[in-house]
Each structure stands twice: as C-alpha cells, then as structure tokens.
Amino acid sequence: MPTGKRKGDVESTKFDLVLRPETITFENFRIGWFYTEARLVIKNPTKNRYTYKIKVTNNDMFDIRTPKGFIDPETSIEIELLHVPGILLPRNDVHHFSVYYIKCDTEAQNSHSIWTSKKSEGCKHVLIRFPNKIIRTQEMKKMEEDDMKQQKERNKLSNEKMGIRNQNMGEKK
C-alpha cells in the first residue's frame, strides 16, 4: 500500500513550530467538481524567526497558495491548501503535506537562498483526508437509475416466466 512518502522524507522527532489542524480534511458538498479549500495554521511559539516550506505528495491533486515564506517569533500564519477538481478522490491518509523549517536571522529577505544553502531543521507530515460520505454526482445518480430500470426489467421477465410456470402447474392439477 503506498504511503505517499517521498524518499528521504522523514519526520523530525523535534519540531519547533505548531501545526493546526494535525490532519487536513477537504470537505465540500461539491468536492471533486470545484476547488475545495482547507487551511493550515502554522504557529511559531519561539523567540526565533523561521523560514518555512510546504510540499505535497501529489502536485496535480493539491495546490498550496503560499508554499514558502517567513514566520516571525510568537506569531501565526494561515496557509490556504486546495484540492484540485476533476481528479478522483484518493483513499484517506495516502497523501500528506510536509512542512519544513529553517531558523533564520531577522534581516533575511530571500527564503530561496536560505533553502538552497541550508538543510531543513525540522519536518512534520499533515495527513490528508476526505469525507467518508461523498455526495452522489449526477452521472452516478443516472447510472444507479439505469441499473434500477434494468433490474426491474429482469424481475418483470422473471415474474412473467414464473407466472407461466405457475399457470402450467395449475393446469396439470
């Protein structure tokens, strides 16, 4: 069973930032048909400034509005995460967002140069889930209706045959 983990993508035992929620759930009555939004809050409870980077296991299925940036001491930021429409929904807990950070000085302006020159100091995975109950699409509803019609026709034919047999049995008595 695929875990959605990248090679070398290992969670840190020590992670200085706080992530909420710990599991992202994309919920919308039109999930799969329209972009579905979820939010991740990153809180920095320390006295240090950090640069963060967020990755995901499938870039075709998910989008991150602000994948890199800075977080100042004792502040929080909210990151918008999106499920892209038109793609089948995967099983729960197969995919995840990975949040990385590096401590930086207060004057740092370019996070790209920090990420190219240093290695991540921490990594945490945020699992991705979808609602257990998915609203039926119009296509699914039509397929179900067609199946019901076919089943009724089969039952009708079967009943007619049984009726003929019952009539024949009645005549023999």
UniProtKB/Swiss-Prot annotation:
Q: Where is the composition biased (Basic and acidic residues)?
A: 141-163
Classify the source by domain of life: Eukaryota
Region spans: Disordered: 141-173
> Per its UniProt record, what SUPFAM superfamilies does this chain match?
PapD-like
Q: Which Gene3D superfamilies match?
A: Immunoglobulins (2.60.40.10)
Task: Please give the coiled-coil regions recorded for this protein.
Answer: none
Q: List the Pfam families.
A: Motile_Sperm
What InterPro entries would the database entry show? Ig-like_fold, MSP_dom, PapD-like_sf
Which residues belong to any copy of the MSP domain?
Answer: 16-133
PANTHER family from the xrefs?
A: MAJOR SPERM PROTEIN
What name goes with this protein? Uncharacterized protein ZK688.12
Q: Whose protein is this, by species?
A: Caenorhabditis elegans
